[in-house]
Swiss-Prot record:
A translational regulator that binds mRNA to regulate translation initiation and/or mRNA stability. Usually binds in the 5'-UTR at or near the Shine-Dalgarno sequence preventing ribosome-binding, thus repressing translation. Its main target seems to be the major flagellin gene, while its function is anatagonized by FliW. Homodimer; the beta-strands of each monomer intercalate to form a hydrophobic core, while the alpha-helices form wings that extend away from the core. This is Translational regulator CsrA. HAMAP family: CsrA. The lineage of its organism: Bacteria, Bacillati, Bacillota, Clostridia, Natranaerobiales.
């Protein structure tokens, strides 16, 4: 992990098109501003983790559900 020290209103660049700026600090909290192209998704780590967990759950459709759906479609087409 690269660790950088920045003061308020100082930035770092990631590639050519992502800029992260220290907007402010309050106690142990740091406020960051992020400029990035609209096609780049930006999430807090805990939100990103939750999205990944939900995607895994959604992709695990049981075979039983698929069998029931297949049966229903076959009955409909008769």
């Amino acid at each position: 992990m690269l660790v950088l020290t920045r003061k308020q209103n100082e930035s770092i660049m990631i590639g050519d098109d992502i800029e992260i700026t220290v907007v402010g600090t309050e106690g142990d909290k740091v406020r960051l501003g992020i400029k990035a192209p609209k096609d780049v998704e930006i999430h807090r780590a805990e939100v990103y983790q939750k999205i990944q967990e939900e995607n895994v759950k959604a992709s695990q459709v049981s075979e039983n559900v698929l069998d029931k759906l297949s049966d229903a479609l076959q009955k409909k087409n008769k």
